[in-house]
Amino acid sequence: MATGKTVKDVSPHEFVKAYAAHLKRSGKIELPLWTDIVKTGKLKELAPYDPDWYYIRAASMARKVYLRGGLGVGAFRRIYGGSKRNGSRPPHFCKSSGGVARHILQQLQTMNIVDLDTKGGRKITSSGQRDLDQVAGRIAAAV
């Protein structure tokens, strides 16, 4: 008997691509004016090349909240942080932009995909879980 597929059953890369396209098609996420000029962290030298980077980051963040839950802005700053190149000096870890993470979480919250957790951070809502699982089911059916 065939059962429904969840986000855990499909490739993360394929899911993020498909869910980012779904978010872009839905038109519920409104892009801020600064998306074409902002860097994603102080560790980066340039702004993202991909014009759809905001949707991809939102899809990735929704997937991470689905899988782990209880993630807040600080956790996403650590997750998307990386090594800052300091020229001739040794590299060091730097957190990513908190404003980008906060704005995406607020957008996902207005779309009713994530909600505030009483223990701190964000958790996935039932409608958000259903939405993510539907996209995962379409990916599994296509394979």
From Swiss-Prot:
InterPro entries assigned to the protein according to its UniProt record, in alphabetical order: Ribosomal_eS19, Ribosomal_eS19_CS, WH-like_DNA-bd_sf, WH_DNA-bd_sf
GO annotations of cellular component type: cytosolic ribosome; cytosolic small ribosomal subunit; plant-type vacuole; plastid
Coiled coil stretches, renumbered: none
Keyword set, alphabetical order: Ribonucleoprotein, Ribosomal protein
A GO biological-process term: translation
Tagged with keyword Membrane: no
Annotated GO MF terms: mRNA binding; structural constituent of ribosome
Protein family membership: Belongs to the eukaryotic ribosomal protein eS19 family.
Protein name: Small ribosomal subunit protein eS19x
